[in-house]
Amino acid sequence: MNGVYDVGGTDGLGPINRPADEPVFRAEWEKVAFAMFPATFRAGFMGLDEFRFGIEQMNPAEYLESPYYWHWIRTYIHHGVRTGKIDLEELERRTQYYRENPDAPLPEHEQKPELIEFVNQAVYGGLPASREVDRPPKFKEGDVVRFSTASPKGHARRARYVRGKTGTVVKHHGAYIYPDTAGNGLGECPEHLYTVRFTAQELWGPEGDPNSSVYYDCWEPYIELVDTKAAAA
């Protein structure tokens, strides 16, 4: 999806002033927002790619001006409403209540040991996205490939700065959930995944550092084989 969410390769945004002692969480609510991801995942709100797509539904100005974990809250709300698991009017009513009564106790709820176990597993071990497929990969290490110029309207992992650029396959990872379908509610549809090396001069032109490269993970439909013999003729 094109938008402010795809800022890779963009300049002119100023320096990144990162404090030397920056904490993992800057506020208590951010800890809750972090823990909510595996919990909402388990509850059927969304998958990982849908999680990202929900963030892409934010107003661009709000996205740029808000803290990182607020993006997470926004996608929980988006998918909670979409799936019928959150009633927006009730959410707004409860939010207003706690704004007016910040010291009021939170609603009681039943502890679910299996959910806590799942959250711990997801946080410390991750949620694997690799899948088995019965078709061989189209590309191998050393192949010269070109990244598609397609401009998707839904969720995808096709950064604008690599579209139309030529690179070299350096690794095949097996098959993984395909974000272009999974992120748009169309199923996992796993595709082979590759790491492709793009030189800085291929990406940025003659002014690019001749000793630098970017390694970009590409799903199979993103790339096509370049006929190097024909190109050299």
From Swiss-Prot:
MF terms (GO), sorted A to Z: nitrile hydratase activity; transition metal ion binding
Temperature-related activity annotation: Optimum temperature is 60 degrees Celsius.
InterPro entries per UniProt: CN_hydtase_beta-like_N (IPR049054), CN_hydtase_beta_C (IPR042262), CN_hydtase_beta_dom_C (IPR024690), Elect_transpt_acc-like_dom_sf (IPR008990), Nitrile_hydratase_bsu (IPR003168)
Coiled coil: none
Biotechnology: Industrial production of acrylamide is now being developed using some of these enzymes.
Reactions it catalyzes: an aliphatic primary amide = an aliphatic nitrile + H2O
EC number: 4.2.1.84
Keyword annotations from UniProtKB, A to Z: Lyase
Family in the record: Belongs to the nitrile hydratase subunit beta family.
Subunit-level organization: Heterotetramer of two alpha and two beta chains.
Protein name as catalogued: Cobalt-containing nitrile hydratase subunit beta
